[in-house]
Amino acid sequence: MRILAIDPSSNRIETSTTGIVLLDNAGLVDSWVLPFGAQNFKNWFKSTGRILEFDIVVVEKFEVRDNDYSRDNSVVETIAAIELCYPNLVLQRNAGYQTDIPNDLLKALGLWSFEKSHHNDVRAAARLGLFYAQRNDIEEVIVDIGNRITQMAS
């Protein structure tokens, strides 16, 4: 299963980035790190995102908190732009994803360090894609994780 997983950025904070990975089961096909915001995502989609082959798009679900005025809720604007490009996307909460997909697993699968960024947003996208597969019992992804770990151990 090919999963396009996206960790959306702020639409206002210029140092924020959107992390994107394309996974083939548990293997990395490609990754991208985009400058902040909706417009930069739309630009990437026009040049790259619209021609990608995938089975599902998974985007981190952002929980708006009305009572926390220090929090940047503009991520929802970036998600809205992503949804215009990929109307059938799945919004996935990330609660528990660091426990279910630990750092050591990402490292073992080669999904820890990425050339194009400081890694955090791309790593979060990779974790989100695997978390979605695990939580939804996507057998081919889970089997591939097991096979890759077994091969590394032998």
Locations of regions flagged by a protein language model:
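Phosphate- and other anionic-substrate recognition elements at nucleic-acid/protein interfaces
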Residues: 1-154
